[in-house]
Amino acid sequence: MKITWLGHSAFRIEIGKATILLDPFLSHNASFSGQDIKHVSAGVTHILLTHGHGDHVGDTVALAKETGAVVLANADLAAWLGSKGLDRLEMGNTGGTIALGSFSATFTNALHSSAQITEDGVSHALGNANGLMLHFEDEASILAMGDTDIFADMALINELHQPDIGLVPIGDRFTMGGAVAALACRRYFNFKTAIPCHFGTFPIIEQTADKFVAGMEGSKTDVKALKAAESLSI
């Protein structure tokens, strides 16, 4: 398994026959600047979306049309994407598990909102914000928390799914900050590896992973604070 952080909450995950883009906010992502969209989208089989905000949907429509990738999203967001011309859509909702060939994805809870703002400035709700629990046969499992604050039912997510790897938002203001994210990981999860994300993209969110790294000191979790475009093989 190879996980590449593309900046913000965007990841490329390569495993077996699957090449996944998660929340592919790329062309307007300052952290992605200097990377090649065609390179990171090459061979993509699936695009997975945690919720409908622009900094997560990102380049989904263009990339899905270009690559033919299957797009997974909550039902409301999937319907909206269908209106944009996408037809290879897998939709679900909180608690549902979708089989996607060599892996499965379960929609978990997240404390956040989900919407798109149209040109007239109106915000249109697009279902629930979610995390995504990814299970691969005979490989480490991944919980992409999505955008969220800490909540006690994270313990149930851990009990049900036992995720090995956590993709953890730490930027504050729109999600939990680094110290709270560390508390969430230590109290509710038994991650073998935690990768912080959703930081450093905009001036108004945390610029480094320092608070998260400090909060995780002494835990059994291996924290990998990647640089944009940096990869981790597991």
Swiss-Prot record:
Keywords recorded for this protein, A-Z: Hydrolase
GO MF annotations, alphabetized: hydrolase activity
InterPro entries: Metallo-B-lactamas, RibonucZ/Hydroxyglut_hydro, UPF0173, UPF0173_UPF0282_UlaG_hydrolase
Record PANTHER family: UPF0173 METAL-DEPENDENT HYDROLASE MJ1163, UPF0173 METAL-DEPENDENT HYDROLASE MJ1163-RELATED
Family per similarity comment: Belongs to the UPF0173 family.
The species this protein was found in: Rhizobium leguminosarum bv. trifolii (strain WSM2304)
HAMAP family reported in the protein's UniProt record: UPF0173
Higher taxonomy: Bacteria, Pseudomonadati, Pseudomonadota, Alphaproteobacteria, Hyphomicrobiales
Pfam family name, one: Lactamase_B_2
Transmembrane segments: none
Protein name (database record): UPF0173 metal-dependent hydrolase Rleg2_1519
